[in-house]
Amino acid sequence: MSTKLQDHFDKITKILSGFGVEGCISYGEITFSIRDQRDIHLILKKLKKEYLFEQLTDVTAVDYLTYGQSDWQVGKVVSQTGFSRGRQQDFKTAAVDNRFEIIYQLLSMANNVRIRVKCKLKDAQIILVDSVSDLWPSANWTEREVYDMFGIYFNNHPDLRRVLTDYGFVGHPLRKDFPQTGYVEMRYDENLGRVVYEPVEIDDRVNTPRVIRN
């Protein structure tokens, strides 16, 4: 670990000492985890002002609904029958605490340092965080993408609309309970002279091989 990276970490930790924030340096990268999602805007505003994080390079999210679960049947039965074919599990939309985590990537060109700031959305009933588009205009579209893909809402966002899927799209494609095949498929109907939507007739099937790590 470089002494310069440690110096940045110590200074930023001191700035955030009054908040519920945990930090670490791992694989040469600085990461801070915010405990309370209500503090996100205030903490990011403080980082921009006091440590000159002028640039927000990305906003994204992770859905941990199926974390640690496998589509493959393993255990004692494997030694007798071999691996089963992986089957796509039917996960119902679940209100699971700590299911979603939102992640911000910040860059300070003045201090030549990048950090990652993340926060678990602890309350499954409140999938809402404050928008930071007033701090970094680039957040406008990245927050729209997170809303479109994960269904996370951003309070005070100036234009929270879908940005990658069409206006009539149902669901959020990067949620773990969204089927890989989707719900509908579209085609051009020559008789009607327009594009029509029809239910998907493809069965879900796992195409990812079982990976064994020692």
Swiss-Prot record:
EC code: 7.1.1.-
ATP-binding as UniProt keyword: no
Gene3D superfamilies referenced in this protein's UniProt entry, alphabetically: NADH:ubiquinone oxidoreductase, 30kDa subunit
Family matches, as Pfam families: Complex1_30kDa
Cellular compartments annotated: Cell inner membrane
One term of GO molecular function: NADH:ubiquinone reductase (non-electrogenic) activity
Membrane topology according to the record: Peripheral membrane protein
Swiss-Prot/TrEMBL catalytic activity: a quinone + NADH + 5 H(+)(in) = a quinol + NAD(+) + 4 H(+)(out)
Keywords: Cell inner membrane, Cell membrane, Membrane, NAD, Quinone, Translocase, Transport, Ubiquinone
One Gene Ontology cellular component: plasma membrane
Family assignment from sequence similarity: Belongs to the complex I 30 kDa subunit family.
Protein function: NDH-1 shuttles electrons from NADH, via FMN and iron-sulfur (Fe-S) centers, to quinones in the respiratory chain. The immediate electron acceptor for the enzyme in this species is believed to be ubiquinone. Couples the redox reaction to proton translocation (for every two electrons transferred, four hydrogen ions are translocated across the cytoplasmic membrane), and thus conserves the redox energy in a proton gradient.
Assembly mode: NDH-1 is composed of 14 different subunits. Subunits NuoB, C, D, E, F, and G constitute the peripheral sector of the complex.
Listed name of the protein: NADH-quinone oxidoreductase subunit C
Organism: Francisella tularensis subsp. tularensis (strain WY96-3418)
